[in-house]
Amino acid sequence: MANKKYDVIVVGAGHAGIEACLSSARLGLNTLMVTTNTDRIGYMSCNPSIGGLAKGHMVREIDVLGGQMGVAADETCIQYKRLNASKGPAVRGTRVQNDKHLYSQFQKEALYNQPNLEVLQGEVKRLILEKDLCVGVVLQDGSEIFGKATIITTGTFMNGVMHIGLRQEAGGRVGDQPSIGLSDQLAQFGFEVKRLKTGTPARLLKDSIDWSKTIPQAGDEKVYPFSFRSSDKLKLPQVLCYLTRTTEETHDIIRGNLDKSPMYCGIIEGVGPRYCPSIEDKITRFAERTSHQTFLEPEGLSTDLIYLQGISTSLPEDVQDRFLKTIPGLENVKVARYGYAVEYDYIEPTQIWHRLETRTIRQLFLAGQINGTSGYEEAAAQGLIAGINAAHSILGREEFILGRDQAYMGVMIDDLVTKGTREPYRMFTSRAEHRLVLREDNTIDRLSDLGRKLGLVSAESFELLTNLRERRQVLHDRLKNTVLYPTKDIQAILATIPTPAMSKSLTFEELLRRPELTSSHLELLNFELDPDPNVVEPVEIEVKYSGYVKRQMDLIVQSKRLEEMLLPDDLAYAEIRGLSNEEKDKLLRVKPRTLGQAQRISGVNPSAIQAIMIHLKGHKKIKEMGLEGQSGAGSTDSILAH
């Protein structure tokens, strides 16, 4: 392996690393994945599930762009559930329980069977840099591997430290050593390196649980798979999850031992995830609550391990034993592995571009938890984008950037690059200002053409997508053009639904806009629907919410005006009158690409945006008077001229 050359080197084999490798290799680039443990490829370090609110949206987006996660999630699903099914379409989300061992195996096989991709077990100790250009990596044995682009996807492993009570151990998760050297080198190069914290709950033995004291939680019978390539018939047997709750006794034990928690005695300095708090955090922040729910989730079909969702903890083992036994159903529980916390390094993400290349070192890309995110889906989305852009940088293609109005992936990356993060970033539907047009059901309509243009979606797969879109259009046209007359028989059927009688002839589209009607009611009126729910549901939503969608699209058009106003690379913020020192510092730090991005920077007020616009207009007038010299590409002059 010594002195071997590749196009793209990917460091790490988690969810970000997998998508980065596959996208690069599928675009024809000679790609190498380096991981410390090939047995842990695609390993689910925490919860054995994929998707959720907003997260499920991103899994579908990854899939339509040619990524891998959706297929793997469908293939290894052991329970399917649609969250918020009774709420509006913008906030519904798909979540699947997975067999974590089969998931890892499926992803590993995908990597080993992918042309243009090699997998190497080894540890990357440092980068090979030629001034500000990354040209490869050095392994622990001293061998050098050269690459035209390098992607770091190290997850929680950079200077990772595990905490159980007051005991500490080096590692990014149980059974795996930390990555030492990379973050120190980046810090020496000038990167702002910070610490974050995450945690995981205990794993319990199935036979030690009294299931009669818990509440079964079944999955959904109707399945909308993540991938357009998957069947709606799940391949694996479906299992139950179970619900139970903590008690006041549970909380008393935890409160009485907070002095033994590394989070509460000052040992852990990193900030933990706000939206996935430990049980210590829950009973402290929500002291008025007498109980918290927890779900018992099987980790697979051939394992006895149960994941205790919602009870992440880093308390000592004896304390965990005591408080677990106060939870109904767990009175005699046996713990296979205790919960623990992990503290790790991350790079402040305002130091990267939207293409996920670092601003300081060329041809070095970052993806996943190294950028301050939390979650498999967030990591996979970044891995896909980093892999595409690393490949494009070598192939001479333009950077691939998704807008906030195009995808949740675009919202996430823009948030990270523009605002940074001080805590593990998790995706929510509330983060997207255009969420009504970023639904799960219309992902194909939003992104399939882009996926084909990128080259990650095969001709055969694109034909499936095209067929699906055409069938949706046919159905929508039939709804628009088929008229229903208010005959006696029709009025009688409407009364049974019930819905008000028709006072005049209506198209089926007009009728479907009634809030009490669903597409299934149309069949009572002899309207033939497509048998595929993936055809019917998106059309029904478009019809019912057409007015809201139109208003959202109008807002997008308005916001795009600011997004299309490019800011020059050499813009001297220090010279702009009307900007506060804080605003100047933040603008210089982020270096926004557009005026739209500038207005999203925390601490930059609307008055600052006006000041920038006035400055640029004034600069343009000076130039038109011939009072300024010529400048190079990317300068204020060239952009204003553009």
Curated annotation (Swiss-Prot):
**Family statement drawn from the similarity comment of this UniProt entry:** Belongs to the MnmG family.
Query: Where do the coiled-coil regions begin and end?
Result: none
The coenzyme or cofactor needed here is:
FAD
GO BP: any one term:
tRNA methylation
- Entries under InterPro entries matching the protein: FAD/NAD-bd_sf (IPR036188), GIDA_C_N (IPR049312), MnmG (IPR004416), MnmG-rel (IPR002218), MnmG-rel_CS (IPR020595), MnmG_C (IPR026904), MnmG_C_subdom (IPR047001), MnmG_C_subdom_sf (IPR044920)
Q: How does it assemble?
A: Homodimer. Heterotetramer of two MnmE and two MnmG subunits.
Which Gene3D superfamilies does this UniProt record tie to the protein?
FAD/NAD(P)-binding domain, GidA associated domain, C-terminal subdomain, tRNA uridine 5-carboxymethylaminomethyl modification enzyme MnmG/GidA
Where does it primarily localize? Answer: cytoplasm
Binding of FAD, residues = G12, A13, G14, H15, A16, G17, V124, S179, Q369
Annotated positions binding NAD(+): 272-286
Q: Which NCBIfam families match?
A: mnmG_gidA (TIGR00136)
Q: What GO cellular-component annotations does this UniProt entry give?
A: cytosol
Where does it localize? Cytoplasm
HAMAP family to which the protein is assigned, alphabetical:
MnmG_GidA (MF_00129)
Protein name, per record: tRNA uridine 5-carboxymethylaminomethyl modification enzyme MnmG
Q: What's the encoding gene here? A: mnmG
The entry's keywords: Cytoplasm, FAD, Flavoprotein, NAD, tRNA processing
Q: Name one GO molecular function term.
A: flavin adenine dinucleotide binding
Superkingdom is: Bacteria
Q: What does this protein do?
A: NAD-binding protein involved in the addition of a carboxymethylaminomethyl (cmnm) group at the wobble position (U34) of certain tRNAs, forming tRNA-cmnm(5)s(2)U34.
